[in-house]
């Protein structure tokens, strides 16, 4: 079995933020949560998160969101405090009391390196176990290794030397193989060495790399894609990581049969599920746990968040969050669905229509300029332009129910709580405050009055007033 330690104690001063660096978002997840998700597939015996700066906040964030990681394979997270941030070696020293009787492998990951693939982690562990190494280091060949220490190996990939860049000779700087900061250790071997670490450097810190010369054998494993080891130190790095992740996600979906009209203007979280023959138009963003059914067309200019869109449905210039839309339905342009709204099949939710906690039955339409809040609509209901469900009385929300095949005229107001039966017609401009039985016509407006010749009379009165005021 493998235990995992995640280094997450640093503040990240270059982020210019009060928020710990590992809690900054990359897509749908924080940096540290991404790291945790990357190692779940190896089924670790325990995951220990080493916290420091605002450690309570890091702990709360991860515990609040643990249900979104993988309950089946993720052990309960453990938190180890590093009260002083004295280097990576010092951080791992804090594990000594927690792993007294542990005799297997320890995988060390960085909480600010969020792009590692699970396959890479598995390759590192497999190599370590197959060769019975004391330590195995993940390495990468960078096109521009400036700022990185270099790793030197023999022909069998056993590490012979780690040289910091400032100590490299001109010949050594030509080696582009660098330390990714990801390790697999034999824990008993490492535990014997950790107390011997010294802070003999300018920073007065304990470096984990200093254990390498004291262990044998130590092997290096190259990552296939060097971008996986990209670390986050500032906001520019965060933006770059987002770019890398988006390219990865969108390439995967295009290979799986999804059409992206303008990939550079589209963002898709890696938690999203798209079925074959989905078309995503420009300036569209699909986030969270959203699912898009086959044959649907999303966008342009739309945001879908934590929502399920059925098959052969179109969404145009609209925002849908925490809602569900069934098959063969048209949404938009400029519609807003939120708050666990549910729209049936063969429906139309059109221009400037807002749904909040609304359920719309199959083959129902709300085509123009309506607000339907806390409302339940049956099948084949037609909502006239400008219809409003007045659901809030200043204290609490109330529900509106509209039966099958009912329809409202333009500019109607349904004052909740109110129920309209089946096959009800609401006359245009009505204000409905009481329940209406099936098969009824309801008219709730003032009777039209026509005063013939009114303008002429008004004109005569105006002339008389003008004459009075004349000198």
UniProtKB/Swiss-Prot annotation:
Main location: cytoplasm
Needed cofactors: Mg(2+)
Pathway membership: Nucleotide-sugar biosynthesis; UDP-N-acetyl-alpha-D-glucosamine biosynthesis; N-acetyl-alpha-D-glucosamine 1-phosphate from alpha-D-glucosamine 6-phosphate (route II): step 2/2; Nucleotide-sugar biosynthesis; UDP-N-acetyl-alpha-D-glucosamine biosynthesis; UDP-N-acetyl-alpha-D-glucosamine from N-acetyl-alpha-D-glucosamine 1-phosphate: step 1/1; Bacterial outer membrane biogenesis; LPS lipid A biosynthesis
Gene3D superfamilies, per database record: Hexapeptide repeat proteins, Spore Coat Polysaccharide Biosynthesis Protein SpsA, Chain A
Entry keywords, A to Z: Acyltransferase, Cell shape, Cell wall biogenesis/degradation, Cytoplasm, Magnesium, Metal-binding, Multifunctional enzyme, Nucleotidyltransferase, Peptidoglycan synthesis, Repeat, Transferase
CDD domains referenced in this protein's UniProt entry, alphabetically: GT2_GlmU_N_bac, LbH_GlmU_C
Region entry N-acetyltransferase, spans: 257-471
UniProt region (Pyrophosphorylase), positions on chain: 1-235
Localization of this protein: Cytoplasm
Reactions mediated catalytically: alpha-D-glucosamine 1-phosphate + acetyl-CoA = N-acetyl-alpha-D-glucosamine 1-phosphate + CoA + H(+); N-acetyl-alpha-D-glucosamine 1-phosphate + UTP + H(+) = UDP-N-acetyl-alpha-D-glucosamine + diphosphate
GO molecular function: glucosamine-1-phosphate N-acetyltransferase activity; magnesium ion binding; structural constituent of carboxysome shell; UDP-N-acetylglucosamine diphosphorylase activity
Chain sites annotated for binding UDP-N-acetyl-alpha-D-glucosamine: 7-10, 21, 82, 87-88, 149, 164, 179, 233, 338, 356, 371, 382
The EC number(s) this enzyme carries: 2.7.7.23, 2.3.1.157
Active site: 368
Cofactor note: Binds 1 Mg(2+) ion per subunit.
Binding site residues for Mg(2+): 112, 233
GO biological process: cell morphogenesis; cell wall organization; lipid A biosynthetic process; peptidoglycan biosynthetic process; regulation of cell shape; UDP-N-acetylglucosamine biosynthetic process
Top-level taxon: Bacteria
Intrachain S-S bonds: none
PANTHER family hit by this protein: BIFUNCTIONAL PROTEIN GLMU, NUCLEOTIDYL TRANSFERASE
Subunit field text: Homotrimer.
Family affiliation: In the N-terminal section; belongs to the N-acetylglucosamine-1-phosphate uridyltransferase family.
Family annotation (HAMAP family): GlmU
Name of the featured protein: Bifunctional protein GlmU
The encoding gene: glmU
């Amino acid at each position: 079995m493998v235990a995992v330690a995640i280094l997450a104690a640093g503040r990240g001063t270059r982020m210019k933020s009060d928020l710990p660096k590992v809690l900054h978002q990359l897509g749908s997840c924080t940096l540290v949560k991404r790291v945790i998700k990357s190692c779940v597939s190896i089924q670790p015996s325990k995951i220990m998160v080493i916290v420091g700066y605002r450690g309570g906040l890091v702990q709360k964030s991860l515990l609040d969101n643990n249900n979104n990681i993988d309950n089946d394979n993720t052990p309960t997270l453990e938190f180890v405090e590093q009260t002083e941030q004295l280097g990576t070696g010092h951080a791992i020293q804090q594990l000594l009391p927690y792993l007294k009787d542990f005799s297997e492998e320890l995988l060390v990951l960085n909480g600010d390196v969020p792009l590692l693939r699970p396959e890479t982690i598995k390759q590192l562990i497999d190599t370590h176990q197959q060769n019975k190494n004391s330590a195995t280091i993940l390495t990468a060949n960078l096109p521009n290794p400036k700022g990185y220490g270099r790793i030197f190996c023999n022909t069998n990939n056993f590490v012979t030397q780690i040289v910091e860049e400032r100590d490299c000779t001109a010949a050594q700087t030509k080696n582009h193989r660098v330390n990714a900061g990801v390790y697999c250790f034999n824990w008993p071997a490492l535990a014997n060495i950790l107390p011997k670490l010294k802070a003999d450097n300018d920073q007065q810190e304990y470096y984990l790399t200093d254990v390498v010369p004291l262990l044998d054998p130590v092997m290096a494993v190259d990552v296939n894609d060097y971008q996986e080891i990209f670390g986050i130190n500032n906001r520019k790095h965060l933006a770059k990581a987002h770019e890398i992740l988006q390219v990865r996600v969108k390439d995967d979906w295009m290979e799986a049969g999804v059409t992206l009209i303008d990939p550079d203007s589209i963002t898709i979280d890696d938690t999203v599920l798209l079925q074959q023959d989905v078309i995503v138009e420009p300036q569209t963003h699909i986030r969270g746990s959203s699912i898009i059914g086959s044959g649907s067309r999303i966008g342009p200019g739309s945001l879908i968040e934590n929502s399920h869109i059925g098959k052969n449905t179109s969404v145009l210039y609209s925002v849908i969050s925490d809602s569900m839309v069934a098959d063969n339905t048209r949404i938009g342009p400029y519609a807003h669905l939120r708050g666990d709204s549910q729209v049936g099949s063969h429906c139309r939710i059109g221009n400037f229509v807002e749904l909040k906690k609304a359920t719309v039955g199959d083959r129902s339409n709300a085509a123009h300029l309506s607000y339907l809040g806390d409302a339940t609509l049956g099948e084949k209901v037609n909502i006239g332009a400008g219809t409003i469900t007045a659901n809030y009385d200043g204290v609490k929300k109330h529900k509106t129910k509209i039966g099958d095949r009912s329809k409202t005229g333009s500019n109607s107001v349904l004052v909740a709580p109110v129920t309209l039966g089946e096959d009800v017609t609401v006359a245009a401009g009505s204000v409905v405050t009481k329940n209406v039985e099936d098969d009824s016509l309801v008219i709730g407006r003032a009777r039209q009055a026509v005063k013939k010749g009114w303008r002429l009379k008004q004109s005569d009165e105006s002339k008389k007033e003008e004459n009075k005021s004349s000198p």
